[in-house]
């Protein structure tokens, strides 16, 4: 039977662009795993995406995933058909401009083919303890490298 994993992700940037960090929390049953990372020159959107990518890469086998993010950019691209349209249009937006962050979107395409991922939007910086923990991990990743 396919495992269902719950993942919370968040990204942060000190300046946008600037130093960035990402954090993710993976939960399965009573098991919790926290991961985080840093980039010296990035954007907030890239860190939001990187959190999701690294969390999905951490899974050891194909899983069903409930992924929670406060990034409208990430969640809307997945749930409102933006990504499908970009693929169909050769990585061009509706206004015929190149899609930003193509490298990361291509990684997300690969990972969402391997795993069955449902994306959920959560309100950032509110009372969601898991999202708040991911925000803390992302900010700590920046602080530890500064």
From Swiss-Prot:
Residues 1-143 form the RNase H type-1 domain. Mg(2+) 1 binds at residues 10, 48, 70. Keywords: Cytoplasm, Endonuclease, Hydrolase, Magnesium, Metal-binding, Nuclease. One of its GO terms (cellular component) is cytoplasm. It is found in: Cytoplasm. Its EC number is 3.1.26.4. GO terms for biological process: DNA replication, removal of RNA primer. Mg(2+) 2 binds at residues 10, 135. InterPro entries: RNase_H, RNaseH-like_sf, RNaseH_domain, RNaseH_sf, RNaseHI. Monomer. Endonuclease that specifically degrades the RNA of RNA-DNA hybrids. This is Ribonuclease H. The lineage of its organism: Bacteria, Pseudomonadati, Chlorobiota, Chlorobiia, Chlorobiales.
